[in-house]
């Protein structure tokens, strides 16, 4: 993801927002629960929906970089 967000979020992210999102992605959870998502959104000044979209897109980017299937549970023998 670009450092300033993207069109899917409908908002340009600041460096501080990206830093908070990335730290949570790498140190807390790649799949935050509803409460954690709400707290991250509040810290970033984003809506819960925008934050959830960011995590979905960031997960897709991470999975692609790791050579993993596009979706969870889609590993094939």
Swiss-Prot record:
Cellular component GO terms, alphabetical: cytoplasm; nucleus
Keyword terms of this UniProt record: Cytoplasm, Developmental protein, Homeobox, Nucleus, Repressor, Transcription, Transcription regulation
GO MF annotation, one: DNA binding
Domain of life: Eukaryota
GO biological process, one term: regulation of transcription by RNA polymerase II
SUPFAM superfamilies: Homeodomain-like
Main location: nucleus
DNA-binding region location: 7-65
UniProt keyword annotation of Transit peptide present: no
Record Pfam families: Homeodomain (PF00046)
Location in the cell: Nucleus; Cytoplasm
PANTHER family with a match to the protein in the record: HOMEODOMAIN-ONLY PROTEIN
Function: Atypical homeodomain protein which does not bind DNA and is required to modulate cardiac growth and development. May act via an interaction with SRF, leading to modulate the expression of SRF-dependent cardiac-specific genes and cardiac development. May act as a co-chaperone for HSPA1A and HSPA1B chaperone proteins and assist in chaperone-mediated protein refolding.
Protein name according to UniProt: Homeodomain-only protein
């Amino acid at each position: 993801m670009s450092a300033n967000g993207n069109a899917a979020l409908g908002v340009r992210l600041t460096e501080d927002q990206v830093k908070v999102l990335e730290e949570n992605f790498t140190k807390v959870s790649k799949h935050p629960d509803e409460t954690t998502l709400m707290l991250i959104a509040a810290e970033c000044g984003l809506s819960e929906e925008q934050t959830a979209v960011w995590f979905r897109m960031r997960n897709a980017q991470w999975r692609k970089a790791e050579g993993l299937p596009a979706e969870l549970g889609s590993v094939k023998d």
